[in-house]
Amino acid sequence: MEARLTKEEVEVLHEQADRTFFHTHFKFLRSHKGFRPKNIHMVLGTSHGGKSTLIRSLLTDICTGAVKQNVLLWLSEETELEFLSEFYRSGINPDNVKNLHVLSELDLMERYKTPKNLLRYIEMYCGENDIGLLFFDNITTSMIYMGRSPSDQAKISIDLKKMCQLLALPFIIIAHTGAAVTDSSNRLIEMNDIRGGKSIVNLAQFFYVLQTFHCDSEIYTTIRITKHRGQEVDHRFYRLIYSRKERLYGRDELVQFKEFKEIYKRRNVL
């Protein structure tokens, strides 16, 4: 195939790159104009490191936004009821949740016993329900991925990217670090600390590392943008501010690199 685009096609690509498709109040997402259609956005963090809290925070942000989008949350570790029980504890108005769809592998595994069948069902569900954003919590504990060989995980990763392209939506995938990696490790968590195969890391266009530091009695939950394909990013370090009342990250704030280094130096180390 001839690798050439017309002038008009190039202009369309440039217009899309400059456009914000999904508005958000989170600054770390606004730094690259929000979630991008046809792009995989990976969030990596330790077990009990705040990933599910971040997902609930992002979903609340989307559900309460001015522009209503149909959103699908695909779960691997919780049932639909378990998720919703925690989600509603934030006090969100049920009227704002009408566009949220939740599917759990724990509820579906008897009907869809193979990765191929489950992926086909997720793809069909997105199409039939006009889903605009897809969240997957958590790939590394999913029946389609966990315990499979590196080659099988690589194939699944490619299938997920193909589905993202076909549905033309942002695909937000949550992943665990390996068991030996903790928030109090003597280094920063990196993309390749993901549990299992690394293929999905290479295929993702955007990558965020969630890491919490304890400095004496203070807690700093940080999110770092480590990959941002096709978008310029001026700032890569942010702190997530937790609201005990809502049990969510209510907002985030920019952290300068110098400040981030100081937080890292002051962290409690076991």
Q: Positions of the model-derived regions?
A:
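Short, active-site-adjacent cap segments at secondary-structure transitions
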Residues: T141-M143, G178-T182
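Flexible loop residues that form catalytic
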Residues: I139, T177, T212
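Charged helix-capping and loop-helix junction motifs
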Residues: P150-D159, E190-I194
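C-terminal regions of RecA-like/P-loop NTPase motor modules
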Residues: M1-F28, H41, S47-S52, C63, ...
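Structural recognition of the conserved hydrophobic beta-strand(s) that form the central parallel beta-sheet
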Residues: L73-W74, F135-F136, L169-T177
